[in-house]
């Protein structure tokens, strides 16, 4: 037997032999046949092709190859029933001609084969069997190369992909547009706490409003202070006219609250000791807000101290420390007459226990929670009355650490109390 025979030729030979009617037979006159023993037919086909493992599943897959070539097609709704499309012309056709047609079809792609087979099956379902002339013309048109279902499917699939790409690009652009206006918003910074830093303006305005009550001898000094402080007013407060400031503070009582101010520097001089009223007023300023009666007149010698006080107010406004931690600078007393006590050292002579004597110690004027946690351990020392510095006099080289040598706050009396500051240590209380 010829091993080069094709499957459709093998089936046609079996149908033409009457001894094979128990395996395969014709069911109609239009080329329809049925495999009565499909497994036996498959076994014979395996023997012909030298494939002992051949079965009906492999045979049916091989028959699908001829669906594309429009040689054999499956009859729908009937099992093991097939039909020759060009029957009875195929009986008279030269096998070489059919082989050449098969060779032309083998050049097609496998994907075209599968898609065309589906089209043929669907066409068989919808349409009844056509006459042989129309079938042959349709077969020639398909194999002419002008028609290809594969190209149509590829074009349709490419269009779908293009639309999908466009759809995926649009959401990305929308997300980018939504994110772009939202990016600059976190960089906005609101400075809300800046208007609260205005305390240094009040003492300046208060000083200007009290000006008419001071004697004419100190008017020049106050004018000099106004020129020093006036450049700082625009940066601390919103622009207001000077007349509004004067009228706002003119109606208030002479008492004006001053944020943490240092004690005004003073030098011990005879006018301070000879005028106890002035000393009392200056000491009350250190412990309470500054109070200047209308009948108070400053002497020309105190004008220098007022200038130094205003300069230090300006310096304190520039400092960045909290209000509770601002300390007054330490002052050095330049007194010519030595003190008989000589508590500190020979290099620091002190005249008396006047308020100028206590101005060497830094003073915290504002109430602060730090005061309760600061202790003067030197004031609690019971050895202070028996110190060698007290017993040996002022010319000794031994220096005992006293409270005047330390830095810390001390309490001052109010306006109604005594004008002298409170005691520091047992030494000062006895003196």
From Swiss-Prot:
Crosslink feature (Glycyl lysine isopeptide (Lys-Gly) (interchain with G-Cter in SUMO2)) location: 167
GO molecular function terms listed in the Swiss-Prot or TrEMBL record: chromatin binding; DNA binding; DNA-binding transcription activator activity, RNA polymerase II-specific; DNA-binding transcription factor activity; DNA-binding transcription factor activity, RNA polymerase II-specific; RNA polymerase II cis-regulatory region sequence-specific DNA binding; sequence-specific double-stranded DNA binding
Skewed-composition ranges (Basic and acidic residues): 118-128, 299-313
GO cellular component term, pick one: nucleus
Superkingdom field: Eukaryota
PROSITE patterns noted in UniProt: ETS_DOMAIN_1 (PS00345), ETS_DOMAIN_2 (PS00346), ETS_DOMAIN_3 (PS50061)
GO biological process annotation, one example: cell differentiation
SMART domains, alphabetized: ETS
Statement: the UniProt record of this protein carries the keyword Ion transport: no
Residue ranges of DNA binding: 5-85
Start and end residues of each stretch annotated as Disordered: 114-139, 251-282, 294-323, 411-431
Modification type Phosphoserine: residues: 180
Biased composition annotated in UniProt, kind: Pro residues: 261-273
Location of this chain's protein in the cell: Nucleus
Family statement: Belongs to the ETS family.
Annotated function: Involved in both transcriptional activation and repression. Interaction with SIRT7 leads to recruitment and stabilization of SIRT7 at promoters, followed by deacetylation of histone H3 at 'Lys-18' (H3K18Ac) and subsequent transcription repression. Forms a ternary complex with the serum response factor (SRF). Requires DNA-bound SRF for ternary complex formation and makes extensive DNA contacts to the 5'side of SRF, but does not bind DNA autonomously.
Full protein name: ETS domain-containing protein Elk-4
Organism: Homo sapiens
Taxonomic placement: Eukaryota, Metazoa, Chordata, Craniata, Vertebrata
